[in-house]
A protein has these predicted regions:
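Cell-wall glycan-active module
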Residues: 1-9, 15-365
């Protein structure tokens, strides 16, 4: 009996130790909070339909990602959502059907698919009795267009082989987040997935979750939030990397586009930024391979602790005679079939920043 008692006691102690270790290494995330949701509602623009529902989705996203529900974070979310969709979960896009048809034809031409093949595919009858071409004429939202193309690709003959990359909708939801980003960051998604992550992006809850992840789910050293807004549009750390490109240009004497892209992705050939850094390799005491490998880390926070990053600024600051900025607004022209005006990342960031400061209480500004 003593043997079994000692065995039970040891098992109990072991179980308690495991539980305590679990608590120590995995602190509980805060649950959604009515108080936080009340604050979100107060900071949202007046006239938002179902403000309580929006607040609940925002609160859940913040809690699930361990992002503090500060006034600044909430106002950043509000500002981006207001800019991107006006707090409409399924915003209508004027002229979307024509835009989509032009984009489909452009992609077909790029793949050397004859126009008659596209026309024949669009003439195929879809499950609702209409042809895909007829349905395309009626689309009003990106969600409708994305669903149409997913159906189209799966149903028409050779659809996956010919048209697998033809879905023109690569962003969606009320924060217009990249679907590729969402698919790469779905590990802790707190909701049951309705079919696919693409579908979830077009839901209010999913669009807000992934949009908030893209906006606030990474550390930065920025002293002004406008750079985070620019990154939301141009990609994580684009503002930091654009500033580095400016420093590289000063140090090397080679003019560079300040677009935040440090390497030429999808190519073995070095881009302009990498060539400029290579011209400094003796001063940096680095090989071309070391330079390339380091620049490839440019989408990480740790990149700014690299010897390359520090040495470039040492050189550039000395030449400039003053510390150069560590963040600048990227000079990127916005490219999208939906955009009909000459807009830039800087324009986007400034517009969102204006909305942000209107949201922030007067004492905070």
């Amino acid at each position: 009996m003593d043997f079994y008692k000692r065995l039970r006691d040891r098992a109990a102690i072991l179980l308690l130790s495991v539980l305590l270790a679990s608590c120590a290494t995995q602190p509980e995330r805060r649950p959604p909070s009515v108080a936080v949701q009340n604050q979100i509602v107060r900071l949202m623009p007046s006239g938002v339909t179902d403000a309580r529902g929006w607040a609940a989705d925002i609160d859940t996203a913040l809690a699930a990602q361990d992002i503090p529900a500060t006034t600044q974070n909430i106002c950043a979310i509000v500002a981006v959502t207001e800019q991107e969709s006006g707090f409409k979960p399924h915003p209508m896009v004027p002229g979307l059907a024509k835009i989509a048809r032009r984009e489909l034809e452009r992609r077909a031409a790029a793949r050397h698919i004859p126009a008659f093949v596209v026309d024949a595919a669009l003439a195929v009858q879809s499950p609702d009795g209409r042809s895909y071409g007829e349905r395309l004429k009626d689309v009003r939202t990106e969600e409708e267009l994305s669903a149409l193309f997913e159906d189209f690709i799966g149903m028409v003959p050779l659809g996956k082989r010919l048209f697998s990359s033809f879905n023109p909708v690569d962003t969606g939801g009320p924060m217009q987040v990249s679907i590729a980003f969402a698919e790469a960051h779905d590990q802790d998604y707190p909701y049951p997935v309705d079919g696919s992550i693409r579908n979830e992006v077009f839901s209010r809850r999913g669009g807000m979750y992934f949009g908030i992840a893209h906006l606030l789910g990474y550390p930065t050293h920025y002293h002004r939030i406008i750079y985070r807004f620019a990154d939301f549009n141009a990609g994580w750390y684009a503002s930091r990397n654009a500033a580095l490109q400016n420093a590289i240009s000063v140090a090397s004497g080679m003019p560079l586009a300040l677009d935040g892209d440090l390497v030429r992705y999808g190519s073995d050939e070095p881009g302009a930024t990498e060539r400029a850094v290579r011209s400094l390799r003796d001063k940096l005491d680095m090989t071309n391979e070391e330079i390339h490998d380091t620049l490839e880390q440019g989408e990480t926070y740790e990149f700014q602790a690299s010897p390359l990053y520090k040495r470039i600024y040492e050189l550039a600051d000395r030449i400039a005679g003053k510390p150069l900025p560590r963040a600048v607004l990227p000079g990127i022209k916005l490219e999208s079939p939906k955009i009909t005006h000459n807009l830039t990342t800087a324009w986007f960031a400034k517009r969102v920043s204006e909305r942000f400061w209107r949201c922030m209480p007067p004492a905070s500004s």
